[in-house]
Amino acid sequence: MEIENHTLITKFLILGLSDDPELQPILFGLFLSMYLVTLLGNLLIILAVSSDSHLHKPMYFLLSNLSFIDICFISTTIPKMLVNMQSQIKDISYIECLTQVFFFNIFAGMDNFLLTLMAYDRFVAICHPLNYTVIMNPRLCALLILMFWIIMFWVSLIHVLLMNELNFSRGTEIPHFFCELAQVLKVSNSDNHVNNVFMYVVTSLLGVIPMTGILMSYSQIFSSLFRMSSTVSKYKAFSTCGSHLCVVTLFYGSGFGVYFSSSVVHSTQRRKVASLMYTVISPMLNPFIYTLRNKDVKGALGKLFNRVASSPSCINDIRNKLLLRSVRQIL
């Protein structure tokens, strides 16, 4: 097969989840439903946190940011997959692939950082409650999130610039449902040693460091829980951490599963399933996990629904509050 320079490559072939034509309508309906549920669930959390003054706390500020990132995360991959399923065309342009790699890495990294920051927030709230408002002040949270955005922007940009130097064959097939960086590197025809080294170093750092922070936070939290004499206090403290633990387990478990399965089990289908867990299932379930046992969020959602049902001007009020909150954060 003739090797073409990357500047002449105009498209890749995304093999998707299945080659069976009869399954395409079923998969299309399934993933469209999951995508819409994810958008609705996470948007409701953002609106609930923004519209209720009782939720203007660091914990819920981080939760609303996580919901925004989850919307962006799933929107990086699923819409293109749905278009390909509907049109029965598996093409993705070279520019689209680079763009998908760029934004996918940004949002995956932001998910990582936010989960770590949320674990630290829970640690401060339980282990240092008297200093909570001093340590977890809104300005610090906003600065940390901005710093994470800057870090992930440059990391993703370097990934894309290195990938842009690779050569690919005409008609290259990517055995995945989106342009995952590791899969794109595997199908290149040029020396990708630098790309692989950078990818594994970044993946290790972005996986090990945040995970270490989460483990250290929860080790201190559990130590404090064991020292509590009141059962009610233990239950209340654990209930604030249970949802976050579920999300962390789902995200990191499936994320690490992708890389372990890539190196140990050479099964493309298993790798796709593992990728689905943290790219689709995790963003979809997060709103349900966080609201299932959270009375404050459920109460805010109830008030939001009541206001929408009773007042036609409610949407304008919410929009104005969102704009006002954005201006305050900038200032």
Swiss-Prot record:
Name listed for the protein in its UniProt record: Olfactory receptor 7D11
Gene3D superfamilies cross-referenced by the UniProt entry: Rhodopsin 7-helix transmembrane proteins
Main localization (coarse): membrane
Lipid bilayer topology: Multi-pass membrane protein
GO term, biological process aspect, one: G protein-coupled receptor signaling pathway
SUPFAM superfamilies (UniProt xref): Family A G protein-coupled receptor-like
Source organism per UniProt: Mus musculus (Mouse)
Extracellular compartment residues: 1-25, 79-97, 164-196, 266-271
Record's function text: Possible olfactory or taste receptor.
InterPro entries (UniProt xref): GPCR_Rhodpsn, GPCR_Rhodpsn_7TM, Olfact_rcpt
Compartments where located: Cell membrane
CDD domains for the chain: 7tmA_OR7-like (cd15234)
Stretches in topological domain Cytoplasmic: 47-57, 119-142, 218-244, 293-331
Family in the record: Belongs to the G-protein coupled receptor 1 family.
Membrane-crossing residue ranges in chain numbering: 26-46, 58-78, 98-118, 143-163, 197-217, 245-265, 272-292
Residues with attached carbohydrate: N5, N167
